[in-house]
């Protein structure tokens, strides 16, 4: 039986992955309130379609940081893709390249960056950085991703400490042993990934540190994990190039707002000075449309990509992306939007919010 929506991929992954792997992918912090609210919040939003418009041609293309993508649906950084499929991030990168979208590679990738790039040399790729306490290690990693052709540096800011994920504690998940990570050398050998993956994330990083990162790279810097207008204003003040509104998929601090509920606050605060993106809770084309109508330039998808990997590797990820893109095309057509530029707040029934 074919899988026709992202929920189908979720159920397939739940049935076929080991319990510890499923718990790791699906888990949220504490009571998982925020994880679940990320999806539920979208369903509270109603659309205001416009009709009798010529929608015989609908163009989903847009740009992020100046690069064109086929649709405003890209791949969020998630770690350890080999948990879901043997080729891991290489399969993910190939699917993203085939779909002409951006893939943000995680610090916690289970394939070497060289192998990921070689698998999809023409793909648009950004790199997500967890800040290491050792500045020299950060510097080497930034230089490495620049040399490999990554086009942006995404700094995750919402993990000064790893959230309390009860399933991982219960399962005593030891990802390093389970994955048997290979291709990991020393910094002298040009691969610093294991030093990130086996060390704590720097809890001391603050706004003033951003200037150091900016001095280390010419890449645009995107901050991932912003949820408030205060932090959005500070991000603009410190000259970042973009913000990903995110609560880490509900895996960090529980009982914070759903990403879509925080989006309008952040969009209003930046006043168009930087691009704003969203991750968290995207499961349908309508979800994508709602996020764009509320001001997101693009959305990033996390868990569904791993579900696609678990189904059929590269081809499973491509199927997930194709379903989302086809649904989004339908949503645009049925609301009278002929281009992404025509998607705006007029589509949202604010009296319900």
Curated annotation (Swiss-Prot):
- Where, by residue number, is the active site? 248 (proton acceptor)
| EC code(s) of this entry | 1.1.3.15
Q: In which pathway does it act?
A: Lipid metabolism; fatty acid metabolism
Q: Could you give one GO CC term from the UniProt record?
A: peroxisomal matrix
Binding, FMN: 77-79, 106, 128, 156, 224, 279-283, 302-303
Say if the entry is tagged with keyword Oxidoreductase: yes
- The residues covered by the FMN hydroxy acid dehydrogenase domain are 2-353
Q: Which GO terms describe its molecular function?
A: (S)-2-hydroxy-acid oxidase activity; FMN binding
One BP annotation, GO: fatty acid oxidation
**Which cofactors must be present for this protein to function?**
FMN
What InterPro entries does its record include?
A: Aldolase_TIM, Alpha-hydoxy_acid_DH_FMN, FMN-dep_DH, FMN_HAD, FMN_hydac_DH_AS
UniProt motif (Microbody targeting signal) ranges: 351-353
Which keywords does this chain's UniProt record carry?
Answer: Fatty acid metabolism, Flavoprotein, FMN, Lipid metabolism, Oxidoreductase, Peroxisome
- Per the similarity annotation, which family is this? Belongs to the FMN-dependent alpha-hydroxy acid dehydrogenase family.
Name recorded for this polypeptide: 2-Hydroxyacid oxidase 2
């Amino acid at each position: 039986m074919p899988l026709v929506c992202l929920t189908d991929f979720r159920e397939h992954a739940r049935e076929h992955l080991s319990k510890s792997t499923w718990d790791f992918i699906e888990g949220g912090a504490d009571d998982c309130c925020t994880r679940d609210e990320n999806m539920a919040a979208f369903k509270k939003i109603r659309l205001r379609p416009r009709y009798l418009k010529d929608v015989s041609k609908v163009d989903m293309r847009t740009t992020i940081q100046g690069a064109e993508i086929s649709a405003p649906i890209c791949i969020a950084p998630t770690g350890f893709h080999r948990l879901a499929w043997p080729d891991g991030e290489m399969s993910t990168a190939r699917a993203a390249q085939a779909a002409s979208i951006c893939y943000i590679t995680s610090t916690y990738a289970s394939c070497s960056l060289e192998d990921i790039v070689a698998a999809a040399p023409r793909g648009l790729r950004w790199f997500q950085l967890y800040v290491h306490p050792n500045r020299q290690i950060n510097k080497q990693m930034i230089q490495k991703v620049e040399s490999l052709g990554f086009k942006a540096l995404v700094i995750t800011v919402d993990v000064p400490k790893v959230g309390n994920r009860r399933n991982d504690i219960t399962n005593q998940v030891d990802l390093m042993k389970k994955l048997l990570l290979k291709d990991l050398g020393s910094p002298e050998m040009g691969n610093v990934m294991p030093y990130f993956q086996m060390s704590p994330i720097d809890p001391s990083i603050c706004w003033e540190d951003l200037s150091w990162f900016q001095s280390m790279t010419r890449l645009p810097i995107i901050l991932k994990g912003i949820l408030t207008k205060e932090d959005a204003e500070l991000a603009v003040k410190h000259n970042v190039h973009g913000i990903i509104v995110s609560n880490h998929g509900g895996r960090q601090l529980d009982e914070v707002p759903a990403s879509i509920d925080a989006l309008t606050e952040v969009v209003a605060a930046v006043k168009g000075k930087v691009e704003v993106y969203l991750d968290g809770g995207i499961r349908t084309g309508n979800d994508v449309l709602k996020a764009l109508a509320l001001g997101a330039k693009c959305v990033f998808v996390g868990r569904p990509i791993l579900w696609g990997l678990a189904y059929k590797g590269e081809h499973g990820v491509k199927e997930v992306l194709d379903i989302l893109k086809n649904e989004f095309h339908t949503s645009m057509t049925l609301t009278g939007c002929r281009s992404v530029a025509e998607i705006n707040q007029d589509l949202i029934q604010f009296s319900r919010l």
